[in-house]
Amino acid sequence: MTRGSAAWPPLPPRLKPIVEAEYPRYSAAEMASRRAAVEAALAAADCDHLVFYGANRAGSAVQWLTQWPVTVEAIGVFTLRERDALFVQWINHAPLAKRLAAEADVAWGGESSIGAVIAALEKRGARENRVGVVGAMNFAQHAALAARFGNIVDLNRAYVRLRRVKSQEEIDWLRIGAWLSDRGMAGLRDGLAVGLNERALGDLIERAYLREGGTNVIHFIGATPMHDPQLGVPAQFPSTRRVANGDLVFAEISAAFWDHSGQVLRSFAVGEEPPPLYRALHAAADAAFDAVAAVLNPGATPAQVVEASGVIEDAGFTIIDDLLHGYGGGYFPPDRKSVV
């Protein structure tokens, strides 16, 4: 492993004001554009109201519409020409939610957030079969909505379609997430040493971006002898195995900036140069990256991507992880009509 004097990744100066803001915010124009898109989706589905849901730090629609990142639970009500109603758990989360979701009417969800949502819909005159939902609500919550408002329209696929093409502002925030992820990898590169266990490697990674406002999404780490490899992918949970000379240490890192994350994967040879197998693997990986990147143009199909990846099999290898996926919205279900 040669450290040299490799520089840490720079942040483009135009993005510094976003990172340094007390609480970064999307512009009013960006938020208005999102609302217009949701209004059009509701009209297409013959719905008047949208219930959007998130829990356990998942549920991107909540933040996308209100700028409140989900913590324990958050359920919102979107209605044309009205302020959103947003009900959060727990009560001690409500003060900050009110500050960040300043354009919504925010309240604690009380003993039942879905009960509060139903009351809000009733107050807004919601009719049967005219309420849509985005987010992974549980069975009891869906049943409660359906008992009061009839057939509930699943708008999750419509929401995914809205999110597939990112705005320029979203791309900027994702660039920050990528910068933070790169910092994590740089921290691993510069701190990696014989004798550290995988838990300590995770500390190197997180320490590199936490101070800049990043949060951990994943840092999968693998360490294995290059002459007797036992791992094909970085492990999802760190072990207490200690790094030794002759190891390959490889990592998959995603750090996020307000739920906008990047992803980076790198490998480091410890104490000696990589043997022929690892050189061949990395040569095949580089060739596959270049071949796939060359076909990623508007209108490209998944079949073209798979065809381009044939250089992997041509080199005598295969893959045991995703060949290609998008970022900034999650993994999407297969769609026969999908184009890049």
Region annotations inferred by a language model:
Residues M1-V340:
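Active-site neighborhoods and metal-handling regions in enzymes and metal-associated proteins
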